[in-house]
Design a protein with these regions (language model features):
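Short hydrophobic/glycine-rich mini-motifs in sensory/regulatory modules
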Residues: 24-28, 98-101, 152-155, 180-185, ...
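N-terminal entry segment of metal-dependent catalytic domains or homologous docking segments
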Residues: 126, 139-192, 197, 203-207, ...
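Short strand-connecting beta-turns/loops that link adjacent beta-strands
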Residues: 180-182, 250-252, 364
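Catalytic core of PPM/PP2C metal-dependent serine/threonine phosphatase domains
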Residues: 69-99, 118-141, 150, 199-270, ...
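Conserved beta-strand-loop-short alpha-helix elements that form
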Residues: 182-194, 257-261, 296-319
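Active-site-proximal, acidic helix/loop segment immediately C-terminal to a metal-coordinating Asp/Glu
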Residues: 193-215, 281, 287, 304-351, ...
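Soluble C-terminal extramembrane regulatory/interaction domains of multi-pass membrane proteins
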Residues: 1-126, 130
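PP2C/PPM family metal-dependent serine/threonine protein phosphatase catalytic domain
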Residues: 149-173, 227-233, 263-297, 341-347
């Protein structure tokens, strides 16, 4: 009422009702403005998602068009070998768009083959390429055997974690897996805050990103779609999350680090140690449609070690202690992860959730 001119207050017979009506209209106008802004942002994010999905479909079409086709000679050798074991089977041998060999054997009598000692080595000799079981097909029915060309590189992974003091659960979540393309994917997410809500946010982030990556979506595109999903759902119960994604091609050693708001990562190759920083904000913070994550590419050679950690472990730019740990030349990645976590705890306490993931690349034995 005091904001109104005196002459108006003196002449208005229903001043309280007038003030209430004006305030209600101002609130409604503010809500409408907020809604318009939200709709505009959502349209922008949705448009970015459509562009990303178009990119996904385009890549799928390119992959289908670049299939190298079946290998009939290898198929005939494989069928002859199976018949020599009295196994009547359907077999297919082909190379995908990336040149990786795929072998599928279907039969109701695979048990004699699987009971053979070193059956993978024998099948590898038949088709002329070293084979391994498909992780995606593990646990399938015993009437179907899916094999893939084995990668020349192998990895060992170590994980150590500690929840914030006084909390029942950690808000950090992570996972690692190998795709059928022979790419190791390591995901680490840190939900904002601590406790159950942060744990739920980070778990959802990891689950969504894993589904995209296992489906063959390009990692950079998968990260952008994840960011869009969090932007669209930030008005519900979801918060924000920092995201680390490391992808290692186990055929070539080509490695990409993708980051949204994440703490620095470290890579030791030979005698050099590289610090990989992040400039972007956490996933789910509105910063424009289609904003890509920070991306760093490099090649990891056998003997290289990477350390990925949440911000409870790496505080500010104080990292000389971590570099000293890396220079000690740990061969056991679990021991390196535990040592890193222990040193961080002694320096900074447990004022935040703390998670360390260590990765070492080696030649396959």
């Amino acid at each position: 009422v005091s904001d109104l001119p005196g002459f108006f207050r003196d002449r208005c017979d229903k001043l309280p009702a007038f003030v209430s009506a004006v305030n209600a209209e101002l609130r409604a106008q503010a809500y409408r403005k907020q809604l318009r802004i939200g709709l505009t942002e959502n349209r922008s994010v949705a448009w970015g998602q459509y562009m990303d999905m178009a990119d996904v479909l385009s890549r799928v079409a390119d992959e289908l068009g670049s299939l190298n086709g079946s290998d009939p000679l290898a198929e005939r050798r494989l069928i002859r070998y199976l018949r020599s074991m009295d196994i009547d089977a359907d077999a297919s041998v082909y190379r995908d768009g990336g040149g990786r060999l795929h072998v599928t054997i279907e039969s109701g009598r695979l048990t004699p083959l699987l009971r053979e000692e070193n059956y993978l080595e024998k099948l590898s000799a038949v088709v002329g390429a070293r084979l391994c079981r498909s992780a995606a097909a593990a646990g399938e029915e015993c009437s179907k055997l899916v094999l893939l060309e084995a990668e020349p590189l192998a990895v060992s992974v170590g994980i150590a974690a500690m929840k914030k003091k006084g909390e029942k659960v950690s808000g950090d979540k992570g996972t690692y897996f190998k795709t059928d393309a022979g790419v190791l994917c390591v995901i680490l997410a840190d939900g904002t805050g601590c406790g159950d809500e942060a744990a739920q946010d980070s778990a959802q982030v990891v689950a969504i990103l894993e589904k995209f990556l296992r489906s063959g979506v390009d990692p950079a595109v998968a990260m952008k779609i994840l960011n869009s999903v969090l932007l669209l759902r930030s008005g519900d119960s979801w918060g924000y999350a920092t995201v680390d994604l490391m992808c290692v091609d186990l055929f070539t050693g080509e490695t990409c680090f993708y980051k949204y708001g994440a703490a620095p990562s470290y890579v030791k190759s030979g005698k050099s140690i590289r610090r990989i920083k992040c400039e972007t904000l956490a996933a789910g913070i509105s910063m424009g449609a289609g904003i890509a994550p920070d991306t760093v590419r490099m090649r990891l050679r056998p003997g290289s070690t990477a350390v990925i950690a949440t911000d409870g472990v790496i505080v500010d730019a104080e990292d000389e202690w971590l570099k000293q740990l890396l220079n000690k030349g740990f061969d056991d990645m679990k021991a390196l992860a535990r040592a890193t976590l222990k040193e961080a705890e002694s320096r900074y306490g447990v004022n935040d959730d703390m998670t360390v993931v260590t990765v070492r690349v080696e030649e396959r034995a």
